Amino acid sequence: MKLYILAVGHKMPGWIASGFDEYTKRMPPELRIELREIKPELRSGGRSAESVMAAERQKIEAALPKGARIVALDERGRDWTTMQLAQALPGWQQDGRDVAFVIGGADGLDPELKARADLLLRISSMTLPHGMVRVLLAEQLYRAWSITQNHPYHRA
């Protein structure tokens, strides 16, 4: 199984890339994280948020690994604790499907994509920069893995 993070946005500051890389390099070979950046659509010329999200949805769908479990990150998604994520990981690994975490653009994710997702998950009740969400998600995936391995990184 491979973990994918599909994120609308590119040209992130160096500290975002450094933070993200720090956690992805810690992951074991059997649970690698791959980032796929999706170029955001321009919201110019009176273009509606709906048309921007629909265009971004098409790009996201083209980048999704075939057959992957889709976990869409959304402010109205389910609140999971780190322990719940850690409990989900072994089941996902046994099922063998890749898992694609999807981070939307400035306007969020298209409703069609959210409806198609296997899980809607909220990272935080606070509004966060999308680049920071990449770092937080990578850290939480590493922490969840460390819990499943009784690794000392996580101290409950």
UniProtKB/Swiss-Prot annotation:
Q: Which residues bind S-adenosyl-L-methionine?
A: L73, G104, I123, S124, S125, M126, T127, L128
Q: State the GO CC annotations.
A: cytoplasm
Q: What class of enzyme is it?
A: transferase
TM stretches of this protein: none
**Where is this protein localized, as stated in its record?**
Cytoplasm
What reaction(s) does this enzyme catalyze?
A: pseudouridine(1915) in 23S rRNA + S-adenosyl-L-methionine = N(3)-methylpseudouridine(1915) in 23S rRNA + S-adenosyl-L-homocysteine + H(+)
* UniProt-recorded Gene Ontology molecular function terms: rRNA (pseudouridine-N3-)-methyltransferase activity
Record EC number: 2.1.1.177
| UniProt keyword list | Cytoplasm, Methyltransferase, rRNA processing, S-adenosyl-L-methionine, Transferase
Query: Which NCBIfam families would you find in this protein's record?
Result: PRK00103.1-4, tRNA_RlmH_YbeA
Quaternary arrangement and interactors, per the entry? Answer: Homodimer.
UniProt function note? Specifically methylates the pseudouridine at position 1915 (m3Psi1915) in 23S rRNA.
Q: Hey, which family's this protein in?
A: Belongs to the RNA methyltransferase RlmH family.
User: What's the protein here called?
Assistant: Ribosomal RNA large subunit methyltransferase H
- Please give the organism: Burkholderia vietnamiensis (strain G4 / LMG 22486)
